[in-house]
Swiss-Prot record:
Organism: Bordetella avium (strain 197N)
A Pfam family that the UniProt record links to this protein: G3P_acyltransf
Name of the protein this chain belongs to: Glycerol-3-phosphate acyltransferase
Record-level GO BP terms: phospholipid biosynthetic process
Main location: membrane
Enzyme class: transferase
Subcellular location: Cell inner membrane
Reactions listed under catalytic activity: an acyl phosphate + sn-glycerol 3-phosphate = a 1-acyl-sn-glycero-3-phosphate + phosphate
Amino acid sequence: MILTEPSPLFAALLIVLAYLIGCVPFAVVVSKLMGLKDPRSYGSKNPGATNVLRTGNKTAAALTLLGDAAKGWFALWLALKLAPGLSSLGYGLVLIAVFLGHLYPVSLGFKGGKGVATALGVLFAVSPWLALATVATWLLVAVVTRYSSLAALVAAFLAPVYYFFGGGTIWPLNAPTAAALVGVSALLFYRHSANIDRLIKGKESRIGSKKA
């Protein structure tokens, strides 16, 4: 069923669906399928690609990254596919919902990942150019510092800034999406609070290191 102008009830269902899509724990699923330990049992205990990489299995980490990013993109793509006339407010709520699904998934007792890959996925849905600018920022900081968390924080801070300044020229600009992206950025900082503390104390693990 495709609705050009979705009813409030259908829009609400799309938001719930986005949350459930976000709940798919790719780090746990990929690790189980590949015979690896549950990522919640080692390293940072975070079910995300960076922690999976600590096993030394780059394929598992890459699949986790792709899966977590894809669900962010897919939730927004599906919402517009089912309801092309979805309002900008509805779109912004779907964006936040899939992100919250990853952070607080019912499938893992509301204890999910930190959201970097899923945030990347929603940025690709908003605009591939916006996502590429954010990825370039992450790569630059990561290569220079070898801190994945610091790279994520810098990219998270700048993504809404990029959206605002490029809006209306490179990609469409609207207030609900801008607010949603600011919300995603704030949540990323909140989820990285422990990393921020370790960065300040000089105890944060660098990319490629193994944490027992």
